[in-house]
Amino acid sequence: MHVSHPRTRRSLLLAASAALAVTGALLTSPPAKAADSPAPAEVSPHAAQTIDDIGASGAWWVNDLQHFSPAVRARVARLLFSEGGLELSSYRYNIGGGGTAVTTPARAAEDFLNPDGSYDWSRDEGGRTFLEYAARYGVKDLIGFVNSAPSRWTTNGKSCGGLLKAENEADFAGYIADVTDHFARQGVRLDYISPFNEPDNSFADCGQEGMPVPVDQRDDIVRALGAEQRARHRKTGIIADESSRTTQFNSELPQWISQPGTARYVSRLAHHTYNDPDDGELGKVHETSASVGKKSWATEICCFGKGTTGWNQEYDPTIDNALLMSRIIYKDFASSHDSAFQWWVALASGYGSDPSTRNDEGWNDGLIYYDPDYAADGNQKLYFTKRYYALGQYSKFVRPGSVAHNVTGAPNGVEVSTYDRNGQWVVVVNNHNTTGTALNLHFNSGTPVHASKAVRTSATENWANVAKPSVRHGTLSTTLAARSVTTYVLDRRGHGSTALAGAWQGQQSGKCLTADASGAAISTCTGGADQSWSYDAEGA
């Protein structure tokens, strides 16, 4: 469905929707429930992990969008990066390998290398354009990721199916560092580099760029790039290894990161979830990451459908697929305790037979879609999916620095995640049920006093401001709309940390303060009846 050009920055999401402290809080007890009221779900008082970012990648739709009008390109940037749009806090820029022998040219990015080793920085116009937009909008984490090294350094001379030659690892590291330096001179700082993507896949069919990287070479590449960046006094971090499946991540990561001198160069661990892992497997991701003392990121997923979160060809712009996406985000944050979620491609053209209707010819890989025949028919309309709005439920509210708290006891068919953000609670709720569902949610710390916002995405609503839930005695109570994703923002009492750790502890000062109308006096005392206790929200 075409969305008309928004008139104001503030109304981007609404326009698209129209087209389609002083004292710490003491622990509280939930109020007695009425006979027909469900038992409350419980928010843990213990912090789980701090969220770094939520975002998407610029592969490879930017190659098409460079041929769209400047007005459309600017609008897409606003829809993705601005406060009135998704307000993404990360963006993945594809550092190209040149596309040599790739049979689908649109699925490869130009590299900057000339045959003589010099650089042509005018290449990759589309990629550079949207990377610069992301920087201009202040996206927190800009990530450069590599699918293949330039073909001159691969074993088969292609940008697909060939390994990086061992003798060219330093050359490759120098190339990536040169790209990083160039963008820094342009005022665009790449915060992280991912030197290989899905290294377990050979991409030998050459349908896209890709480079297999054996387990015993991954540490060599990380060390080469890390040493090169350090020699140039760059603070760009390295993320790795972006395995396609969590099973590979769990078994292979410990092998390469344990090699001497490697771990110090790794800022974040990265995995994909194309094996549709269950909670147990996701829990192993957390264990693997914790065992090496690193935070993990979920850096790519797409293309699930037909009622499951497993790989399936389907195009579904409806709330059904949006709920599947939201379930994946929920599990990444709640089960593997990832600190970031990054969707595959922000835009795509593979909507199949009809951009407004579910069909089996397209793919669920984008948030927004455009006409694959734009060059012939001149159609530059944008088509929105419910996934766009569902991602916004997280990206706009679960901002960098938000602290996740696990939730237990949610009703059947309901998934609840909670985040402590700047003196407020953010609650994102997925209701997979086909009927309205009652929810009571009790907070064991940082007691909320009232709800300040409620936004819902459902079958009939894209981005709707809805009635706020009641909040009483630290418990949120509401009825969730059928088949919906809803975010609640709750103001709470006090602004200290909500994490409670360790045992209650106190320290006796040996002094007492006596005050009356004539003044105050400090005296030595031993406590006893004169002693009172207060709770410091910093915990033990």
Name every feature range the model reports, one short phrase each:
Residues 37-190, 195, 213-215, 219, ...:
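N-terminal catalytic cores of secreted or lumenal carbohydrate-active enzymes
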Residues 120-129, 237-238, 264-310:
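Glycoside hydrolase catalytic-domain groove-lining segments
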Residues 152-259, 278-289:
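Active-site cleft segment of glycoside hydrolase catalytic domains centered on the general acid/base Glu
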Residues 396, 408-450, 483:
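Carbohydrate-binding surface patches
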Residues 495-518, 532-540:
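Extracellular glycan-recognition/adhesion modules and their associated mucin-like linkers
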